C-alpha cells in the first residue's frame, strides 16, 4: 500500500477495458438515519457523514447496551470493517468473511452466513435493493438481505481484501496482488471488476497495472483497490489504488529498477466511465513507489471553493484535492510525521540512488492516512498513524513500531490544517462525522468523540479490545467492532451504545 510526495503526475487518457453491458436501476438504500449522500449505501460520495440526534451536548449519555463475540479470525485480528445499519438491523462481516445480521436494539443475531475464508482486510459489506454484497478472499457474493440466503457468487482472478462499492445497478470489487501470507504475488495485477448487481455477471474490468508489468512479470506486481470506489451524481467511478512491487526492490533490481518508469496506475486516483470502465483521467501521487505508500482511500466527492473536487489520501501522509473534471490539483497537504523522504521514489525512478538516504523513514509502510477520511461542509478529517520504518538498502525494509496517532482537520477550500488531536495509539479505523462531532477509534481500544471546531475530546469509551474498525451511527445508537486484541485476555466483540442506555 503506497504513497509519497513527488512531482505528481496528472493526465487525461483512455485505456483498454472490458466490454460493458447493460445498466441496472439506482441502488441507493435508505435508513432512518441517512439523508442525501449519507454513509454507507447512499454515501456514493464517501463523505462518511450521517444524520443523528447525537451531538456534543448529549454524547456523554451514550451507554453500552450490548456486545456480542466476533468469532472469525483473519491474519490481522478479527474485525476491520465498518458495520452497516439499515432499518434497525446491523450487518457485519468479520475477517473470516462471515456475515451476520443483528437486531440493532437487542443485539440478537437474526441470521448468519459462514464463509470461513480468512481475509487480510479491510473488508466489509454494501447493501442495495434487498441484497447484501460482500466478498471472500477469492469471490464476490450477494445475499438476500432478509434471510442471508446466497443469491450469487462470482469468482475473481486474484485476492480480495475490500468492501464492495454499489451504484446504479453495478457492484464494484477489485483484486489485489497478494499471497495468502500477505506478501506480493509476482505476476499478479490488481483489477477492478464491475458486475451486474442482480446476477453477478461481469460487465467490464480495469487493470490498474499493465499485463506486461513493466517488463518483468516474473518479479513485479501492482495496483488494486483496498477500499470501495466513490461515485459522483453522473455515476462516474473514482478510486484510489495500491502500490507496485517488489519494494523497495530486490538485490538484483534495487529501488524498483525491475519496473522502470512511474508504474501507472499504481498509487493513484483514477476516474472511470461507469458504462465502459474506460479511464477518463488519473492523478498519480507517488510515481514508482518504493515505500508501500498506497493512495488507497476512497476519494471524497465534495465541493471546494465552488467547484466539485475528489479528495484522496494514503499512507504517504498526504491529502490531495483534485478537480473532478480534469484531475488537476486544487490543493495538497501533508499530515502526520515526515522526515525528508517524500521524494525518494522520484529519485529512484530517475536512477539518482545516491540521493536516497537509508535509515529511519517516516511515515512507514503502515503509517500515514491508513484509513478513510470523513468530511462535512467545512472540513476534511484525516485519521493518522505515526509509524516509521527502517530502510536498510535498495532491497530491504524493516517494519517500525506504531507509536502514536492523530486526527487532523483540514480546511475544505484550502487544505490548511485547522487543528490536530494527538493520541498515544494509532488511529487505524475510518472516521465518521455527525453534527459537531467526529468519531475515531484507536489501536489500543478506545472510541474518541472530538469537537469538529477544535479537536477537543468530548467523550470517550474503552472497548473490550483494540480496534482498527470504523464506527457507525443510526439514530441514537452507535455500533463498532473491537477486533484487534492488543493484550492477553482481550476478546474481539461487536459493541453497541445508546443515548441513555
Regions found by a protein language model. Name each.
Residues 20-22:
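C-terminal motif of bacterial Sec signal peptides marking the signal peptidase cleavage site
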Residues 24-26:
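Bacterial signal peptide processing site
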Residues 29-65, 396-397:
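Blade/loop signatures of beta-propeller domains
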Residues 31-42, 76-98, 117-140, 160-192, ...:
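Repeat-blade elements of multi-bladed beta-propeller folds
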Residues 63-65, 108-112, 149-152, 203-205, ...:
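A structural motif specific to WD40 beta-propellers
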Residues 66-74, 115-118, 203-219, 279-292, ...:
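Surface-exposed loop and turn segments in beta-propeller and other repeat-based domains
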Residues 103-106, 144-147, 196-199, 274-276, ...:
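Short loop/turn segments that connect beta-strands within beta-propeller blades
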Residues 289-290, 339-342, 347-356, 422-429, ...:
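Conserved blade-ending motifs and adjacent loop-strand segments that build the rim/top face
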Amino acid at each position: 500500500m503506497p504513497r509519497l510526495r513527488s512531482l505528481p503526475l496528472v493526465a487525461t487518457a483512455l485505456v483498454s477495458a472490458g466490454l460493458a453491458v447493460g445498466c441496472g436501476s439506482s441502488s441507493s438504500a435508505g435508513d432512518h438515519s441517512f439523508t442525501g449522500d449519507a454513509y454507507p449505501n447512499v454515501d456514493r460520495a464517501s463523505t462518511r457523514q450521517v444524520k443523528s440526534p447525537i451531538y456534543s451536548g448529549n454524547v456523554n449519555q451514550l451507554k453500552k447496551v450490548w456486545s456480542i463475540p466476533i468469532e472469525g479470525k483473519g491474519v490481522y485480528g478479527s474485525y476491520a470493517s465498518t458495520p452497516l445499519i439499515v432499518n434497525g438491523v446491523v450487518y457485519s462481516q468479520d475477517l473470516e468473511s462471515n456475515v451476520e445480521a443483528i437486531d440493532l436494539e437487542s443485539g440478537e443475531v437474526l441470521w448468519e452466513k459462514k464463509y470461513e475464508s480468512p481475509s487480510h482486510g479491510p473488508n466489509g459489506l454494501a447493501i442495495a435493493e434487498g441484497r447484501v454484497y460482500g466478498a471472500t478472499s477469492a469471490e464476490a457474493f450477494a445475499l438476500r438481505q432478509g434471510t442471508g440466503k446466497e443469491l450469487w457468487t462470482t469468482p475473481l482472478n486474484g485476492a480480495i481484501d475490500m468492501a464492495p462499492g454499489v451504484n446504479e445497478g453495478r457492484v464494484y470489487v477489485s483484486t489485489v496482488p497478494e499471497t495468502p501470507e500477505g506478501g506480493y504475488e509476482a505476476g499478479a495485477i490488481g483489477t477492478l471488476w464491475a458486475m451486474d448487481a442482480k446476477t453477478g455477471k461481469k460487465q467490464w474490468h480495469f487493470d490498474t497495472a499493465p499485463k506486461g508489468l513493466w517488463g518483468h512479470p516474473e518479479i513485479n506486481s501492482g495496483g488494486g483497490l483496498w477500499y470501495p470506489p466513490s461515485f459522483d451524481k453522473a455515476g462516474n467511478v473514482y478510486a484510489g489504488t495500491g502500490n507496485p512491487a517488489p519494494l523497495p526492490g530486490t538485490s538484483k533490481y534495487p529501488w524498483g529498477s525491475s519496473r522502470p518508469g512511474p508504474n501507472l496506475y499504481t498509487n493513484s486516483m483514477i476516474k472511470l466511465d461507469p458504462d465502459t470502465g474506460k479511464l477518463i483521467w488519473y492523478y498519480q501521487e507517488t510515481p514508482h513507489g518504493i515505500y508501500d505508500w498506497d493512495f488507497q482511500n476512497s476519494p471524497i466527492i465534495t465541493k471546494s471553493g465552488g467547484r466539485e473536487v475528489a479528495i484522496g489520501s494514503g499512507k504517504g501522509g498526504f491529502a490531495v484535492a483534485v478537480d473532478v473534471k480534469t484531475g488537476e490539483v486544487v490543493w495538497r497537504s501533508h499530515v502526520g510525521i515526515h522526515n525528508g523522504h517524500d521524494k525518494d521514489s522520484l529519485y529512484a525512478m530517475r536512477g539518482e540512488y545516491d540521493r536516497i538516504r537509508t535509515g529511519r523513514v517516516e511515515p512507514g509502510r503502515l503509517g500515514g492516512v491508513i484509513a478513510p477520511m470523513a468530511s462535512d461542509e467545512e472540513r476534511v478529517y484525516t485519521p493518522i498513524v505515526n509509524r516509521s520504518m527502517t530502510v536498510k538498502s535498495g532491497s530491504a525494509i524493516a517494519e517500525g513500531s506504531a507509536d502514536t496517532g492523530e486526527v487532523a482537520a483540514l480546511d475544505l477550500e484550502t487544505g490548511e490544517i485547522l487543528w490536530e488531536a494527538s493520541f498515544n495509539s494509532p488511529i487505524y479505523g475510518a472516521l465518521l462525522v455527525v453534527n459537531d462531532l467526529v468519531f475515531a477509534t484507536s489501536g489500543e481500544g478506545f472510541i474518541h468523540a472530538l469537537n469538529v471546531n477544535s479537536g477537543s475530546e468530548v467523550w470517550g469509551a474503552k472497548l473490550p479490545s483494540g480496534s482498527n474498525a470504523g464506527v457507525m451511527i443510526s439514530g441514537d445508537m452507535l455500533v463498532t467492532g473491537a477486533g484487534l486484541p492488543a493484550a492477553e485476555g482481550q476478546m474481539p466483540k461487536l459493541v453497541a451504545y445508546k443515548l441513555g442506555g
